[in-house]
Regions:
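Long, low-complexity, polar and repeat-rich extracellular regions
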Residues: 1-360
């Protein structure tokens, strides 16, 4: 074990992490300033092969490429950070990058050369009471599209250890902001994912940027074309969501609006001719207290709306819902939602729609 307090760490070379824990070692850090300059692959906190880091009152700044403020890498690891400040400026240097398990609480951070956060493989990021911003308006690293948060699986082997069965991103009582002018706030490709947001503000230009993009890719050998789609269960709890959803036919988005949540947007199911069409690319679930404000006529695979839940247009008028060519709900709006599969008045939730137990 290592205990470090009221200290300053600086590095100027390639591959020089500020604090590094590996092989089941544990580090406790409090009131430490970490600065990594010039050299790439120089993270502030890095844990691999079941290494553990507990950190509080950290001030972390990195300048190089592939230098996240906080990262878990090959072999997985666990990092918790509280009451801290993050800053990154390099390409491919998100504030948080997880191939393990990372929790942050009461953290403020700004990334100027990368997205907010990234999860590779079946790993996890949990965010509480934090404000994280990306001011980068370029594609981060070698990503296929611009994004605020990416959940994916590469072929690097870095994400060989899983801390959960899904790539799991959760944010509670927080603010996530990106200034990208295209792409998606959440981008999922070549993996299965879970996103849960509770009382968290998403700040992005929803007129230009999708809320969610789940699709296959032809970049970086991230899976085989036609079978490398993204699958995500995306849940809002007491959430105000804006922005459209794009999902291709080899992918799957299962959206849940719960506990007084509201989503304003529409959806597009794009054809991916390289693979077999998913049975249900897009399912929208609206509980009895929530609302979907449909901004234009939209086709979904399945639509489940509990009694009391609302599906309306921007003027508050009930939209028409058609299921397999038959009118299920006759609305007063010109907007039409078409379900090619099933329509019901019940929704079924699972652990994929629930917040994880906090470790912090």
């Amino acid at each position: 074990k290592l205990f470090l307090s009221k200290s300053s760490i600086a590095s100027t070379s390639e591959g020089s992490n500020g604090i590094f824990s590996t092989d089941k070692a544990t580090v406790y850090a409090n009131d430490v300033k970490i600065t990594t300059k010039k050299g790439g692959n120089s993270r502030g906190l890095d844990a691999t092969y079941s290494g553990v880091i507990y950190a509080n009152k950290m001030n972390i700044s990195t300048e190089g490429d592939h230098s996240a403020s906080v990262a878990t890498d090959r072999g997985g690891g666990y990092i918790s950070v509280t009451n801290s400040t993050f800053k990154t400026s390099g390409s491919g240097s998100p504030l948080i990058y997880s191939t393990g398990d990372i929790e942050v609480d009461a953290v403020k951070g700004t990334a100027t050369g990368s997205q907010i956060a990234g999860i590779e493989g079946q790993n996890r990021i949990l965010i509480y009471n934090s404000s994280l911003t990306s001011t980068n308006d370029a594609i981060s690293g070698s990503d296929p599209i611009k994004n605020g948060v990416i959940i994916y699986q590469s072929t690097s082997g870095d994400a060989e250890t899983a801390s959960s069965k899904l790539g799991d991103f959760e944010a509670v009582d927080s603010t996530l902001k990106t200034t990208i002018s295209g792409g998606a706030m959440f981008y999922v490709t070549n993996t299965n994912a879970k996103v849960v947001l509770q009382n968290t503000k998403l700040d992005f230009d929803s007129s230009k940027v999708d809320l969610i993009n789940a699709s296959g890719n032809n970049s970086n050998s991230w899976g085989s074309q036609g079978s490398n789609g993204g699958k995500v269960t995306f849940t809002g709890i007491k959430e105000i969501l804006k922005g459209n959803i794009t999902v291709d036919t080899i992918s799957n988005v299962n959206l849940y609006l719960t506990k007084n949540s509201k989503w304003t947007g529409s959806a597009t199911i794009e054809n991916n001719s390289a693979g077999t069409t998913s049975k249900s690319p897009l399912t929208v679930n609206v509980d009895k207290s929530s609302k979907w404000v449909v901004t234009k006529s939209t086709t979904v695979s399945n639509l489940n709306v509990e009694k009391g839940g609302k599906v309306v247009d921007s003027k508050g008028k009930t939209v028409t819902i058609k299921v397999n060519g038959k009118t299920k709900v006759k609305g007063s709006s010109e907007v039409v939602v078409t379900a090619t599969g099933k329509y019901s008045d019940t929704i079924k939730t699972s652990s994929k729609s629930s917040l994880s137990t906090r470790v912090l």
